[in-house]
């Protein structure tokens, strides 16, 4: 029924075959395979057995850790498992028979090519939750993306030097999600935090999601050995984050922008998702949030007119933070507004030099 439903839902989609997963026994496989072959014309290309242990070590939300010293051994083991339980030649033949996807249009102007904007992004074992598509959207518009690490022994200056850049050449900063709680002690002691704070005070556009928001809050509270330890963060926003054992926000979010900011137009309605075991605490009673969530948890929930509403999003100068993750192709105003804010920042820096 599932295979028929997928095939018939959209006749324009070509379903070349299915691979069975989590198969408990040879009898289990035979029953499912015979049912598919009897009632559909879709070939079964393989059957992956149920495994005793998860082959990919994971933390919260089924995401693996970025730091995994055994990743090659793990990948080799998975490759062997797939090779032994699927018809690789039929899979390759089916894939090779598919039409080529059209190349996405490039929107790079001559001006952008001659002098690209440099947008840095934090990338290390603490911050690495990024959609590649978000990077692609920025690159399509001519942005040069520059990775920086908070956990590296190298200073930002040394890291930038490898790209023939200095701190003054950076036009924006993107801080994605990750596991900052696992490195809270190292982060709180990092000599690189003042540089981020300096960029923010200079009005640099900074866009932070989830873990990035935690970095920009005052403190991060994380349970260790049955008690909470508190770690000072950058403190851009007068708010703190606290971790719990169960998810505090998980799933899709529907957002309405209720206050002006450089990234999401006032009144715009868009979608994102939440992925966090922490929540915002100790916010000021008069704290103003940028978004009202029709669906989702956000940073806080308030009883208003007999309705329990959720709110998210903070802004300080050009520094933005929220729990909501975006998928840039579905929120087209994000990349364009981020770039326009970065371009204006570069212009102002040159005029004030």
Put a short name on every predicted segment:
Residues 1, 28-33, 56-63, 132-134, ...:
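Short acidic, glycine/serine/threonine-rich loops at helix termini
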Residues 1-111:
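Internal gly/pro-rich beta-alpha loop/helix module
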Residues 3-7, 34-37, 134-140, 190-191, ...:
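Short, solvent-exposed amphipathic alpha-helical segments in soluble enzyme
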Residues 68-118, 315-353:
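NTP-binding/hydrolysis catalytic cores, primarily Walker-type P-loop NTPases
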Residues 111, 115-201:
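Phosphate-binding active sites in nucleotide-utilizing proteins
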Residues 114, 127-137, 144, 243, ...:
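C-terminal and late-domain segments of enzyme folds
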Residues 173, 209, 234, 275, ...:
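Hydrophobic, well-ordered secondary-structure elements that form the walls
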Residues 179-262:
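Cysteine-nucleophile active-site neighborhood
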């Amino acid at each position: 029924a599932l295979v028929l439903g997928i095939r018939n839902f959209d006749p324009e989609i070509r379903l070349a075959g299915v691979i069975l997963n989590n198969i408990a026994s040879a009898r289990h496989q035979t029953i499912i395979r015979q049912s598919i072959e009897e009632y559909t014309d879709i070939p079964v290309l393989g059957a992956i057995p149920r495994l005793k242990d998860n082959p990919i070590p994971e933390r919260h939300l089924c995401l693996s850790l970025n730091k995994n010293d055994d990743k090659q051994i793990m990948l080799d083991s998975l490759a062997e498992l797939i090779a032994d339980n699927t018809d690789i030649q039929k899979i390759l033949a089916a894939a090779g028979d598919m039409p080529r996807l059209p190349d996405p249009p490039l929107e790079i102007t001559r001006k952008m090519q001659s002098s690209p904007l440099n947008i840095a992004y934090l990338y290390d074992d603490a911050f690495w939750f990024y959609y590649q598509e978000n990077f692609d959207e920025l690159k399509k518009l001519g942005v040069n993306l520059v990775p920086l690490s908070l956990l590296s022994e190298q200073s930002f200056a040394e890291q930038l030097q490898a790209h023939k850049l200095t701190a003054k050449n950076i036009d924006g900063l993107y801080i994605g999600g990750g596991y900052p709680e696992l490195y809270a002690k190292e982060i709180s002691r990092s000599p690189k935090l003042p540089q981020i704070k300096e960029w923010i005070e200079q009005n640099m556009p900074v866009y932070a999601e989830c873990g990035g928001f935690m970095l920009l809050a005052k403190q991060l509270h994380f349970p260790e050995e049955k008690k909470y330890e508190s770690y000072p963060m950058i403190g851009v926003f007068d708010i703190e984050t606290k971790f719990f054992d169960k998810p505090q926000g998980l799933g899709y979010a529907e957002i309405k922008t209720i206050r002006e900011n450089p990234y999401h137009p006032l009144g715009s309605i868009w979608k994102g998702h939440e992925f966090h075991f922490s929540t915002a605490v100790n916010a000021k009673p008069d704290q103003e949030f940028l978004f009202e969530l029709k669906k989702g948890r956000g940073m806080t929930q308030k009883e208003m007119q007999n309705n329990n509403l959720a709110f998210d999003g903070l802004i300080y100068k050009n520094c933005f933070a929220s729990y909501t993750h975006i998928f840039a192709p579905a929120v087209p105003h994000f990349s364009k507004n981020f770039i326009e804010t970065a371009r204006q920042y570069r212009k102002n820096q040159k005029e004030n030099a």
